[in-house]
Amino acid sequence: MALRLYDTLTKEKRDFAPLDPSRVRMYVCGPTVYDFAHIGNARPVIVFDVLFRLLRHLYGENHVKYVRNITDVDDKINDRAARDYPGLPLNESIRKVTEQTERQFHDDVDALGCLRPTVEPRATEHIGEMRTIIDRLVEGGFAYVADDHVLFSPGAMNAADSVLPRYGALANRSLDEMIAGARVDVAPYKRDATDFVLWKPSKPGEPSWPSPAGIATQGRPGWHIECSAMSWKHLGETFDIHGGGIDLVFPHHENEVAQSCCAFHTSRMAQTWMHNGFLQVEGEKMSKSLGNFVTIRELLATEKFGGRKWDGATLRLAMLKTHYRQPIDWTADALHEAEKAIFDWSDFTKDATPGSCDDVIAALTDDLNTPKMIAELHALRRAGKADELCGAMELLGISPVVRGTVDLDATAKSLIDARTAARARKDFKESDRIRDELAAMGIAIKDGKDSDGKPVTTWEIAR
């Protein structure tokens, strides 16, 4: 079954042909470990976990190498460490922040049903590779030293021979457009506004390492060079797939291409570039100022969103209802709908043995067409094919959820209490209205009598 993927660079869907079918290689940009991951961060984790699972199915579990990095050196980490542990030396407080945040990230994405990557390298473990690449770039005339910084020159790249790609090709921007669109002051040590930092001097107390390019003072890497170094170390100069969020296309991924191709004199860093779309919450951009900023942990463990906690399988399915390249609107209604499907499928497959699911796989091989995939899951349910549905859920990392293991949210509890009060005062019109509102939330109300003959109301998640 042929796999077709949309390539951000060529702007077209193409047949996927790995450089080496016995060693399929994928790199995805991972978290900067300074705080809990938010729901927008969960989207690429889930999307590329599905792709990882599909590649393992198509090429064999032992023939796919998935690398997702951990960024553990960054200004945001330094600021968080100084704020949370003011009494400790900065290096020690940074270690506490990064180790704790990495554990939190793993707990959260494990709950979402995601497999661990084959390799999960930390940036600080690859400083030597970063220095090697930087030295090559300086020697090749693509980078220069200024005021103890090392900067990359996109202009030098575009003036070089035709083997190299054009800087700006991935983001479909020209250098002139980038210069015209610059909205920040250009540092005085830069030769050109588009030049970007490969290495910079460390401030007193900050993490620091011996510098490349003959610089006497110690320093630390820029963000972009980290991923070039880690992908090179674990996947080679050129590999099959590079993924991440659409917000990383420029400047991060554009700069990765520039660094890697110029350092290794290659025309491509990755054969296929894949990017997932943006996420908004209830129709608005997610932001702390709007009060709609929500972390994975808050969705799993608190009642912040929709007035209740949510199971990881529900979050996963809700994320997959929208095609990965399209923007997604994260809503409580979508979570209720996903949960209803999960409960139904879980009940239906509880005694099933995982079977083949060719139609589901066919949908996924069409550029991860998860809306079509979900339609196929519903079709299997309607056709009574429990084994096939069970196999599809297993392939997709959708864990069965036992009915009753999800807490009833505060809003629903309040509505049920209000309906009970309405029935007690014989306000049946209000009682029926609340019943319909609960039904719209996926909660079925049943009225009956207890062993003493007194009225009693029970509820269940509707099928």
From Swiss-Prot:
Subunit structure: Monomer.
A Pfam entry, by short name: tRNA-synt_1e
GO molecular function: ATP binding; cysteine-tRNA ligase activity; zinc ion binding
Superkingdom assignment: Bacteria
Keywords recorded for this protein, A-Z: Aminoacyl-tRNA synthetase, ATP-binding, Cytoplasm, Ligase, Metal-binding, Nucleotide-binding, Protein biosynthesis, Zinc
Protein name: Cysteine--tRNA ligase
UniProt cofactor(s): Zn(2+)
Keyword Zinc-finger attached: no
Binding site for ATP: 288
Note on cofactor: Binds 1 zinc ion per subunit.
Gene3D superfamilies, alphabetized: Cysteine-tRNA ligase, C-terminal anti-codon recognition domain, HUPs
